[in-house]
């Protein structure tokens, strides 16, 4: 979309073409994060041309179950599933149209998301979804009853660490405007799940909520 807008001369907000492309491609962004020593969940890429019988041993060797399966290029947690060994095959069928997907180790712990606005560390929010995780329904359905906790209960040192990682990731990809980085906080470590260059701006969305808490109206 950013490329189309640039070609027809229409200004737009948030990140440009290259940063947006890097962020939406989870494999590319993960490689960048690994190169710069950003802690992320272990993962493998799976092609549906590969034999499924080889996948289970590969997962067990790499990180074990449960796992998270997800498309390489999607947003809003569309077609993201937490799987164990017994239901992995059935869940994979739902992602077959993508041809290639990512399979990640499942990191338990607290779900915390942090927002950057330009060169400012805007703030963070913790999520406690009633569902298994903060999926599409939890994000966009008011009946999902996800608890939003702000301010986040972290020490000043850990909060500063969280915001520094978020700012670093924002800059590594060359982002501008607003970004939101999604983390799991487990055993005193922040695991970066992904960065969103077009974070939601609905009534249930997180960046507006963080902004209002910081005294910025949307």
Region locations from a protein language model:
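Phosphate-binding site of ATP-dependent enzymes
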Residues: 84-158, 185-191
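Short, intrinsically disordered, charge-balanced linker/junction segments flanking boundaries
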Residues: 41, 215-218
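Internal helical hairpin/lid segments
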Residues: 144-149, 158-179
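A short, polar/charged loop-to-alpha-helix boundary motif
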Residues: 132-138, 202-210
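A short, GP-enriched loop/loop-strand-helix hinge that lies immediately N-terminal to
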Residues: 1-24, 39-45
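Conserved metal-phosphate-binding beta-hairpin within the catalytic cores
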Residues: 5, 105, 114, 170-201, ...
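Active-site nucleotide/adenylate-binding loops and adjacent lid/helix of ATP-dependent enzymes
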Residues: 21-109
């Amino acid at each position: 979309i950013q490329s189309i807008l640039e070609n027809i001369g229409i200004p737009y907000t948030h990140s440009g073409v290259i940063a947006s492309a890097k962020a939406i491609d989870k494999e590319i962004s993960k490689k960048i994060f690994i190169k710069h020593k950003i802690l992320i969940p272990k993962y493998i890429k799976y092609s549906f041309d590969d034999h499924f019988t080889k996948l289970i041993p590969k997962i067990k060797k790499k990180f074990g179950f449960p796992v998270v399966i997800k498309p390489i290029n999607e947003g809003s947690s569309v077609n993201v599933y937490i799987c164990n060994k017994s239901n992995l095959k059935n869940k994979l069928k739902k992602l077959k149209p993508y041809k290639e997907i990512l399979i990640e180790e499942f990191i338990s712990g607290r779900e915390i998301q942090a927002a950057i606005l330009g060169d400012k560390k805007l703030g963070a929010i913790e999520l406690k979804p009633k569902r298994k995780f903060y999926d599409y329904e939890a994000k966009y359905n008011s009946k999902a009853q996800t608890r939003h906790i702000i301010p986040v209960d972290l020490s000043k040192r850990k909060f500063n660490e969280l915001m520094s990682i978020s700012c670093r990731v924002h800059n590594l990809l060359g982002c501008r405007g607003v970004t939101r980085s999604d983390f799991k906080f487990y055993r005193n470590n922040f695991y970066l799940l992904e960065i969103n260059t077009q974070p939601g701006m609905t009534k249930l969305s997180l960046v507006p909520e963080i902004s209002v808490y910081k005294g910025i109206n949307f």
